Structure formats: C-alpha cells, structure tokens
C-alpha cells in the first residue's frame, strides 16, 4: 500500500463507522473495495491487517454500531470476505470472533438492516469471497450459513436470489474439491457432508409441488454442470437424473424453460459422452412432451451438438420443422416437395398453437425461422439439408402475410387471416430467406424467391422495417446469384429482374417516409459497389432515373438520408454511373464534386459532412478522376474545409485523407520484420524536397499541427500517429539531414502559437519544409502519444484521490486537500 494512502486510511475508517458522518455514495465504496482487492492480490492480507489495525477496528465497530448505514455494512461484509479469502488471514480473523459476528446469527441476520437487499447481497458476496479453502467449509457448516443460503434462493430481490444460487454452486464445487476431486462419487454415499446437504436440498426442491422451488433446483444444477467439468458431476447426474426425468410426468411440466437449459447444459458437458443412454432418453422424451414454445430451443440445441445419436438428431430436426410443415400442408393442394414433410406427422399441439391467437402463431413461426436461420450456416446442420422445401415454405409464409397464398384447408384459411399484414413474421421470414441465398435450389424456386421479394418491395402496405429487410434479402440473393461461366455478365435471371427492380427502387427513393428512402439508398450503394462493373447492371441502372433521384436526395430534409445519398453518389461516381454518358449530362458529372464540397462547407448536420469526407478519402485512394486531375488542389481544398469543421469526426476523417495523400507522396509505411535484413533507404534530396513542398502547399502541416493540439482526443491521437509516420519516413532518408546544413526554424516556431490556438498559418504554403521537419523532430511525439492514450480521469482514478474525496465528504480535509472531480 502506498504511504500516502496508508496515512489517510485511519481517518477514512473512522468516517465509515461514524453514523453521524455523511458517507460517500455506493460508487465510491465499490471503488474502495476494488482497490482493497488489488492490494490483497499483491501482498498478504494478514500483514496488511497487522500493519493497519484500523481495518480490524473497522470490522469490529461494524458489529457494535446498530444504526450503521446499509451501504457501509454491505461494504464491510464484502471487505471481510476479501481478507478471509487467504486461509491464514481467515484464521487471524477467527481469533477475534469477527467472522461469526459478521456472517453468523449475531451479525446482520438478526438486525433490521437485513431487510435491505444491499445488505443481503453483501453478505452473500462476502461469503463467496471467503469460501476458498477447507476452513471456510467448516465455518459455513458450524454457523448455519448453508441454510441461510437455501432461504435466500427464494429472495424477493432477483439479484439476491441469483447470487444465492451462484454461491450454492460455488460451495458445492469447493466441497467436492476438498473431498473426492478427480474421483467419481458413488450415488449412494461417499459425498462430503456439505455436498450431501446441498444435494438433499436440491432433491427435495425437485420433488416440490411449487414451481419456484423446482426452478431454483434446476438453475443450481444448470450452473453446476456449466461451470464444473470434473468427473464427480457424472455421479451427480446419475443421482439426480431420475428426479429430473420425473418432471416430464407432470402436467403441466414445471419450469420448462429451466428444464431445457439443464438438459442442454448436461449434453454440452465434456464429462458426458454420446453413449450415455439415460441422458439421451430423457432428451427424447422431452422432445415429445414439451410444448412448441420449448421444443424449438431444445431441438436447436441438440442439432448444434457435435456429438449426438443420429436418431435423436433426426427427431430434433423433425420437431424444428413441424411449424413450417403445418404451414405447407395448410396451403398446398398437392403433396409438397420431398424432404420437409417426409416423416413429419401432424402435431396437434403445434397446430393448436398456430391457431390459438395471432400472438402465439406469430411467436411460434418467428422462433422457428430464427432457429433455422441460426442452424443453416453451421457445419453440423442436418444433411441432406432440405433447401428447396425450406425455400418453398418461407415463400409461402411471406405470401400468407401479404394475402396472396391459396389456403388448402380450414387451417390454411385461418392462417391467412391470422398472418395477414403481420410485420413481425414478415421480418423473420425475410431474414431467413436472405440466409437461404447461400444454398442452391431449383431455378423455379429461385424465381419464386425473387418474385416474392419484388412483391414485398412493391407492396404499398409494406412497413419501413419490412422494406429494409426486403432490401437486405434481395441484395443477398442478387450477390449470390451465379454468373455465366467465362463471361462478365450476370446470370440469365438477373437482367430481367433488374429491369423490374429499378422502377420499384425509383418509387422507394421518392417515399414519404425517410427510413424507406434511406434503406433504398443503402441498397443502391451496396449493389453498385459489387456490380458496378457488370454490363447488365450498368445498362439497367443508366436506363432508369435512379441516379438522378439519388442526386436530388442530396437536398433531402432528413440528414440521415442526405448522408446516405452522399455515399451512394460517391459510389456511383467512382463507377462512372452517377449520370448517363451522353454529352448533355457532362455538366452534371462535373458538378458532383462541387455539390459535395458545398455540403461539407454548409450542411448543418454532421452525418452528411462525415459522409462527404469518407467519399473524398475513397476518391483519393482509388484515383477518382476528380481527385487525380489536380491532386494537390483537391487535397488542399478538402483539408481547408475540414479544418473549419466543428465536428471532430470530420476533422479525424480529414487526417485520414491526409494520411492517404502522405502515403501517395512519400510511399507507404515501412513494414518491420524482425527476421529481415534492414536495407537503408536512399532517396535523392531534390525529389524528396519537392514532395515536402507539396505537403506544405496543400496545407497538410498546418492541418496536422492544428489537429495535434485539438481539444478532442481522437483527433489529436490521429494527428500524432500521422506526424510520427511522417517523421519516421523522413528519418530513413539521410540525404535530407545533410541538405542545406542547419535549417531556419524561426518561421515554424512563430507559427506554433497559432497552431496551439487552432489557427492555420496564412498563407498555408509559406513554411519551409526543412524548418517544419526540424521542429517536428524536436517534438516529443512518443511522449505525447502516451499522454493521449491515458484516460482523461487517470489522476482522479488513483486510490489516493479516492480516499481524499471520501474524507472530504465527511469534512475531514480542509482547504484544497481534496481532489474532488
């Protein structure tokens, strides 16, 4: 412990135990406890208590003061547990009967403050820290702590109840470590006394008629099997599995959600092998007995296992497919495609759930689609994967939602009415439909998928969220479509689809809802980025009014839309698609740069300006015509606009653009390989000097040095990195250091106050490169980078500052001794 903190500690302990003194808030107490944990990790707790007896006095006074605040009492319990985690310190505290007074009946259990959840939570957390060694087990047994933990499992505070269950698992594992670690225990005996008591309690709870009791027992077992992979857990399952299996005989099955969690946790445990028949028998029974709400998660969990009996995997997959199979049977006159309906008998419970209400029907279908979406990309998914059937079922679900499905039975008619306009199911189905694009399927079904997506995009009743999902799914299908072998054109289905798609996209770009316009622009950007070089796509796009509409949206009243329009137009321009190639559109093609520069200069919102800077950076990096025509003028103009911006992200993006220009001018950063022979880089002085003059001419030095003193730390950090790269790049050329002898740094030093004040030198190109670089080498950029890497409150986070603040709250410090922040 630091001497400064040790000097403040007695006064702080006096403040904490004095009910008349105002105590700092719980956050300060939490930080104080964290500090003590750090201290005890580095030194002996016994030595700490012996050198600072005020800590023992603090714990002793807690037992005597009746009206102590609940926060300080909870802190003291946790602090005592932290000290007692070391067994020798546990014995030291036992000598003074401190621990029985804190954690036994004489302590807070008999006080009125026990009614405060914070105190009960502190008691549990203190015991959790204390229970690290065999002496702690005897202490728990001798003072009835385990029985108190049992009662706290049903606490009215969910946090306390959860912590009690976690503590029970920890005590069980500690008991087994002290007993038969590494050796499986016999079901009938040889359990350590503490473990035996816990197991008896769990068995009793599993047999209880009260569902909360069953839930508590199942949660304890789930946590145990999740945390402990020792052989004794196998004996634990052998002992308790009959009790667990008996829950399936009740109607209704109690705590079904916790029951599923337990089965999956046991199945995932490495202690159990796929040959464990009793476990898989229980799982198979559960798949038959549970309701649809809980069967789906259990089936998904089984299918995600790497090792599982094949018969059980088949059963689980059939359970997972039942809701979609019911949908297909209710809407298809002829038998559906093989694979989905084979072996999937009508399940009365599933049908009842689909017909019960709109919420239950939507919930079941959404969960099923989400489970299948999660399963589809996994290597252990069922094989063969019924791609065609799933595609057909998903299209059918979407048609039920838009009212175009043809019912084949009364169930189908009911589903048509229930799912009509159901946005929740539409979103889930579109997500899964997008995932199915990664698989193969017959051309007829692919055509159906694209058709239903186009209908969703075209339907006037589609909500903004549905349209966004439809755009995303359409993009995935288009990008995954096969191309004609040996040809740069798209496959046979896509050109016609694009000719139908772009008129719909035009309408969505004019939609009154800004979210729809934004989604349409994002779709256009992604499609152009991937397909900008495809002849079919270029022809269809330029034949439409989409580029002109996207250009008009640069003036949209909503800033998010303007930002998306900037990104879209930047991408279209990079591909030569922002305007038709006819001569009458030449002016439109040339004016885009000025339009974007105007947005950067005058737009009142930050999002469009940030988007413009990202577009300009990409243009410079990719050699866009507007950037390549006069690169220095382009960079100078953009940096000048960015330097005046009040948004720190715009200024940071300006530094990114400057770094790109720097790399193009001086070469990319060197790669450092520890195994490579370092060859000296030699560059003629004249070309290097000219390159540096170009950097001065575009105002890069002014911009970077102003940013170095920026009040926003990310900007200063980025500028520091840029200047370090520049300095290291220059340092590799010995010719510059030899050129011109001693540079005159007077002009650069005169400009330094302007840079600190955030002002650029006027004019920007009047600096001598050698003088600027000489000053650059004189700056401690490494030290500045280290300083910038520290958090803004690194001083206030110190333990000494914390103790001073807490003492100041109690009025123990005078003048400016406190470091209140």
Curated annotation (Swiss-Prot):
GO terms for biological process: apoptotic process; cell migration; cell population proliferation; DNA damage response; glucose metabolic process; integrator complex assembly; mitochondrion localization; positive regulation of cell growth. Ubiquitously expressed. Changing residue 159 to E: Decreased interaction with INTS11. Changing residue 59 to P: In RMFSL; uncertain significance. It comes from the Eukaryota. GO terms for cellular component: cytoplasm; cytosol; membrane; nucleoplasm; nucleus. Zn(2+) binds at residue 820. Disulfide bonds: none annotated. A motif (BRAT1-like motif) lies at residues 819-821. GO terms for molecular function: ribonuclease inhibitor activity. The modification Phosphoserine is found at residue 742. Residues 741-767 are annotated as: Disordered. HEAT repeats lie at residues 495-531, 544-576. Residues 100-200 are annotated as: Required for interaction with NDFIP1. Changing residue 140 to P: In NEDCAS and RMFSL; uncertain significance. Ubiquitinated by NEDD4, NEDD4L and ITCH; mono- and polyubiquitinated forms are detected. Keywords: Cytoplasm, Disease variant, DNA damage, Epilepsy, Nucleus, Phosphoprotein, Repeat, Ubl conjugation. The BRAT1-like motif mediates inhibition of the endonuclease activity of INTS11 by forming hyrogen bond and hydrophobic interactions with the active site of INTS11: Cys-820 coordinates one of the two active site zinc ions of INTS11. Component of a multiprotein complex required for the assembly of the RNA endonuclease module of the integrator complex. Associates with INTS9 and INTS11 in the cytoplasm and blocks the active site of INTS11 to inhibit the endonuclease activity of INTS11 before formation of the full integrator complex. Following dissociation of WDR73 of the complex, BRAT1 facilitates the nuclear import of the INTS9-INTS11 heterodimer. In the nucleus, INTS4 is integrated to the INTS9-INTS11 heterodimer and BRAT1 is released from the mature RNA endonuclease module by inositol hexakisphosphate (InsP6). It is linked to Rigidity and multifocal seizure syndrome, lethal neonatal: A lethal, neonatal, neurologic disorder characterized by episodic jerking that is apparent in utero, lack of psychomotor development, axial and limb rigidity, frequent multifocal seizures, and dysautonomia. At birth, affected individuals have small heads, overlapping cranial sutures, small or absent fontanels, and depressed frontal bones. Infants show poorly responsive focal jerks of the tongue, face and arms in a nearly continuous sequence throughout life. Belongs to the BRAT1 family. Part of the multiprotein complex composed of BRAT1, WDR73, as well as integrator complex subunits INTS9 and INTS11. Interacts with BRCA1 and ATM. Interacts with MTOR and RPTOR. Interacts with NDFIP1. Interacts with SMC1A and PRKDC. This is Integrator complex assembly factor BRAT1. It comes from Homo sapiens (Human). The gene is BRAT1.
């Amino acid at each position: 412990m630091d001497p400064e903190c040790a000097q403040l500690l007695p006064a702080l302990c006096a403040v904490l135990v004095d009910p008349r003194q105002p105590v700092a808030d719980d956050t300060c107490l939490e930080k104080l406890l964290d500090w003590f944990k750090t201290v005890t990790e580095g030194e002996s707790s016994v030595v700490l208590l012996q050198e600072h007896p005020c800590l023992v006095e603090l714990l002793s006074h807690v037992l005597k003061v009746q009206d102590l605040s609940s926060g300080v009492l909870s802190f003291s319990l946790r602090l005592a547990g932290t000290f007692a985690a070391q067994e020798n310190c546990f014995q030291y505290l036992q000598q003074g009967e401190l621990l029985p007074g804190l954690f036994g009946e004489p302590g807070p259990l008999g006080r009125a403050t026990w009614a405060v959840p914070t105190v009960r939570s502190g008691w549990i957390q203190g015991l959790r820290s204390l229970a690290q060694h065999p002496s702690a087990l005897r202490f728990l047994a001798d003072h009835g702590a385990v029985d108190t933990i049992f009662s706290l499992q049903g606490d009215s505070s969910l946090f306390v109840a959860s912590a009690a269950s976690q503590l029970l698992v920890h005590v069980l594992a500690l008991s087994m470590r002290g007993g038969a670690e590494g050796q499986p225990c016999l079901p009938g005996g040889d359990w350590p006394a503490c473990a035996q008591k816990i197991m008896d309690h769990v068995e009793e709870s599993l047999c209880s008629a009260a569902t909360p009791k069953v839930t508590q027992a199942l949660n304890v077992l789930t946590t145990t099997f999740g945390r402990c992979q020792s052989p004794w857990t196998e004996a634990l399952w052998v002992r308790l599995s009959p009790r667990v299996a008996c829950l399936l005989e009740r109607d209704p099955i109690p705590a079904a959600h916790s029951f599923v969690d337990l089965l999956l946790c046991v199945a995932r445990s490495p202690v159990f092998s796929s040959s464990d028949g009793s476990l898989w028998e229980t799982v198979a029974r559960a798949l038959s007995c549970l309701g649809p709400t809980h069967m789906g998660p259990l089936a998904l969990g089984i299918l995600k296992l790497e090792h599982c009996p094949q018969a059980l995997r088949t059963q689980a997959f059939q359970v997972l497919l039942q809701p979609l199979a019911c949908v297909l049977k209710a809407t298809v006159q002829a038998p559906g495609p093989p694979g989905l309906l084979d072996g999937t008998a009508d399940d009365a419970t599933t049908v009842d759930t689909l017909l019960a209400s709109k919420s239950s029907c939507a919930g079941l279908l959404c969960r099923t689609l989400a489970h299948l979406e999660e399963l589809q990309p996994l290597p252990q998914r069922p094989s063969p994967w019924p791609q065609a059937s799933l595609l057909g079922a998903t299209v059918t679900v979407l048609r039920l939602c838009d009212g175009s499905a043809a019912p084949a039975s009364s169930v189908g008619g009911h589903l048509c009415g229930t799912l009509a306009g159901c946005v929740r199911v539409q979103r889930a189905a579109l997500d899964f439909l997008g995932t199915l694009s990664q698989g193969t399927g017959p051309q007829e079904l692919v055509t159906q998928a694209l058709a239903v997506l186009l209908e969703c995009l075209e339907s006037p009743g589609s909500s903004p969220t549905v349209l966004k999902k439809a755009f995303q799914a359409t993009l995935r299908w288009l990008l995954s479509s096969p191309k004609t072998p040996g040809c740069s054109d798209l496959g046979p289905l896509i050109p016609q689809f694009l000719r139908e798609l772009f008129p719909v996209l035009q309408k969505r770009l004019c939609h009154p809802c800004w979210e729809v316009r934004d989604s349409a622009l994002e779709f256009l950007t992604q499609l152009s980025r991937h397909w900008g070089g495809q002849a079919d796509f270029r022809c269809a796009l330029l034949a439409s009014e989409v580029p002109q509409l996207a250009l008009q949206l640069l003036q949209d009243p909503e800033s998010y839309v303007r930002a998306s329009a900037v990104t879209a137009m930047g991408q279209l321009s990079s591909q030569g698609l922002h305007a038709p190639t006819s001569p009458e559109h030449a002016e439109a093609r040339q004016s885009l740069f000025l339009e974007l520069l105007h947005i950067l200069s005058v737009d009142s919102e930050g999002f469009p300006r940030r988007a413009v800077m990202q577009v300009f950076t990409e243009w410079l990096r990719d050699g866009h015509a507007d950037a390549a025509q006069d690169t220095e003028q382009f960079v100078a103009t953009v940096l000048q606009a960015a330097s005046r911006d009040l948004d720190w992200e715009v200024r940071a993006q300006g530094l990114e653009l400057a770094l790109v220009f720097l790399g193009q001018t001086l070469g990319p950063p060197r790669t450092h390989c520890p195994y490579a022979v370092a060859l000296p880089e030699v560059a003629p002085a004249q070309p290097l000097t000219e390159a540096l003059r170009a950097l001065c001419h575009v105002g890069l030095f002014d911009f970077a040095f102003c940013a170095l003193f920026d009040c926003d730390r990310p900007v200063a950090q980025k500028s520091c990195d840029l200047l370090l790269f520049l300095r290291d790049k220059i340092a590799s050329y010995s010719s510059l250091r030899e050129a011109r002898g001693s540079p005159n740094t007077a002009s650069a030093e005169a400009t330094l106050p302007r840079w600190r004040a955030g002002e650029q030198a006027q004019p920007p190109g009047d600096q001598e490169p050698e003088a600027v670089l000489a000053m650059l080498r004189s700056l401690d950029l490494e030290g500045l980078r280290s300083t910038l890497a520290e958090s803004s409150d690194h001083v206030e986070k110190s333990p000494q500052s914390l103790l001073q603040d807490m003492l100041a709250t109690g009025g123990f410090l005078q003048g400016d001794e406190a470091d209140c922040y």
